[in-house]
Amino acid sequence: FFYKFIKLALPGAKFIHCYRDPWDNAISLFKQNYSISVFFASSFFGIALEYANYEHLMKFWKEQDGPDAFLDVKYEDLVQNDTNYINKLWEYCGLQGRYSEEKRQKHFGYTASFQQVTKEIYKSSVKKADFSKFHQIFMSDLENQREYWKKLQ
């Protein structure tokens, strides 16, 4: 959401847009119980609205600054072929040296779980069946919010 501010403050900044399947993303957000710090994540309805709003915002910035303003990385593709994507990310960012999986595993990061940063990239968060009884209503809410944005254009 702060893309333009960052771009103005750091004109040479590179922007990586990592996105994933909306339902998988919703499950992940909901399960983390971010209700105090990320209020919309306390319901699938709130997540659906926020996800559609985020999609609209990304569309806006890509129309404003062109398709090359961001390097788009689909999460599902990243976890299937992480080495290929890591090399693309390094090249896009103009980083010198080589990627080191060993260093990545030793890195400390602030995420929902320290174990998420230190363990190997895993594929178990793709196409989850958790909360399946809410899937259809989530997709309907997501589509309704997408339609809302289309009507405003």
Where are these regions (language model features)?
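Conserved phosphate-donor/acceptor-positioning beta-strand/loop module used by diverse small-molecule
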Residues: 6-31, 89
